[in-house]
């Protein structure tokens, strides 16, 4: 459903930068399906929604959380498709990586029956960082708040994607509703064709149309499609409150839905490669080839805003944690470690997945550039760095 929705948006897109971005998403996602590797290195924190039949019996001494985390551990350390461990213990302190992407975030509901309904998502941190919540007054307009808030999210959530909206309950209930809404398949075009019949369906269409009218576009490059669908779940709330949560999903949408009935494992069928559109990406005659091994500051002065650059050569990688360590080294007056030389080099804001088999490097999607804004002046002034590669936007401090 997601590939079909991106392709539909690609076909109607009029902005060349946005159309190019969606072409690359479609082409790269097919390559990833062929190679059994993620399109982005951030395979996120595992979120699980369970509906457990009250007649289910367990043949194990493990707790429910232990069983799920054992599955996460096995999946993320699979030798043929090792995924990045992204989960930090002691989040307000030393932030030590747990090493196996556990623990998962688990939501459980007890229902009638003897089966287990499982919805599971591996959602990256870039889109999660743009989650929003507000406690509106009962008389306030939900759509107005969303249309005002979406531009403040920038492009770090990697559109085109989905918006999950949770309305009602309490503050924490609204957030859970928004997250669970993202598990639903894309069907906004079918809804528009048959027409809205409920309040939430009317809201879905109105938000979908007004957010896309903002012109943010794929990867924030300006265009017709920012959201591929809007999902809404609601819950009764207190008369004095109107809690609203909004959580976006990025272009690397990953979720699965299956049922365990006690007869054995549930096998997931990989998508048919024929489901991908047969498209090619033409970089155009104005694209510039850039050799990062020989580039100079004078070369960069000739670049123009909006140009397509085809990079080759070597570049360093690092995110805010690495930048903070560099900052501490420079403050102490110490030298950078042997082999770390930024003079006339580019840095790519990324933490790649470990390579498997004959890979040189694992999947490496860019990190939101604003995370490194506060280190930019130091890197340019103190290290000899001349270029940075990231996604989304830069803030006033960096600019």
Predicted regions and their residues:
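A generic structural signal for short beta-strands and their flanking turns/coil linkers
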Residues: 161, 226, 286, 307, ...
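Non-transmembrane, aqueous-exposed alpha-helical and coiled segments at domain scale
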Residues: 1-281, 367, 379-381
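Feature captures the catalytic cores and cofactor-binding loops of soluble hydro-lyases/lyases
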Residues: 182, 186-215, 219-222, 317-399
């Amino acid at each position: 459903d997601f590939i079909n929705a991106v392709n539909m948006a690609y076909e109607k897109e009029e902005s060349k930068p946005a159309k190019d971005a969606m072409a690359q998403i479609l082409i790269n996602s097919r390559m990833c399906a062929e190679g059994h590797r993620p399109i982005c290195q951030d395979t996120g924190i595992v979120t699980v929604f369970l509906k457990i039949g009250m007649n289910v019996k367990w043949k194990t001494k493990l707790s429910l959380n232990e069983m799920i985390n054992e599955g996460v551990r096995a999946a993320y350390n699979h030798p043929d498709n090792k995924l990045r461990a992204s989960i930090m213990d002691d989040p307000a302190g030393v932030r030590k990586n747990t090493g196996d992407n556990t623990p998962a975030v688990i939501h459980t509901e007890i229902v009638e029956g003897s089966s287990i309904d499982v919805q599971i998502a591996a959602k990256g941190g870039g889109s999660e960082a743009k989650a929003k919540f507000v406690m509106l007054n009962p008389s306030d307009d939900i759509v107005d708040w969303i249309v005002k808030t979406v531009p403040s999210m920038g492009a770090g959530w990697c559109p085109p994607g989905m918006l999950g909206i949770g309305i009602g309950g309490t503050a924490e209930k609204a957030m859970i509703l928004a997250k669970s809404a993202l598990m639903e398949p894309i069907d906004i075009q079918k809804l528009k064709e048959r027409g809205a019949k409920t309040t939430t369906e009317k809201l879905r269409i109105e938000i979908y149309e007004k957010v896309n009218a903002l012109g943010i576009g794929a990867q924030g490059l300006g265009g017709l499609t920012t959201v591929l669908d809007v999902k809404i779940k609601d819950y009764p709330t207190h008369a004095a409150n109107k809690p609203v949560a909004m959580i976006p999903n990025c272009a690397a949408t990953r979720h699965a839905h299956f049922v365990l009935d006690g007869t054995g494992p549930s096998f997931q069928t990989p998508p048919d490669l024929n489901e991908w559109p047969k498209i090619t990406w033409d970089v155009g005659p104005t694209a510039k080839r850039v050799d990062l091994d020989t580039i100079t500051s004078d070369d960069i002065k000739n670049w123009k805003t909006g140009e397509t650059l085809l990079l080759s050569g070597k570049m360093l990688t690092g995110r805010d944690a690495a930048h903070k360590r560099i900052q501490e080294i420079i403050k102490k007056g110490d030298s950078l470690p042997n082999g770390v030389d930024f003079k006339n080099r580019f840095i790519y804001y990324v933490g790649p997945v470990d390579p498997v088999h004959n890979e040189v490097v694992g999947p490496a999607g860019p990190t939101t550039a604003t995370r490194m804004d506060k280190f930019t002046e130091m890197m340019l002034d103190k290290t000899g760095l001349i270029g940075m590669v990231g996604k989304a936007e830069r803030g006033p401090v960096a600019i």
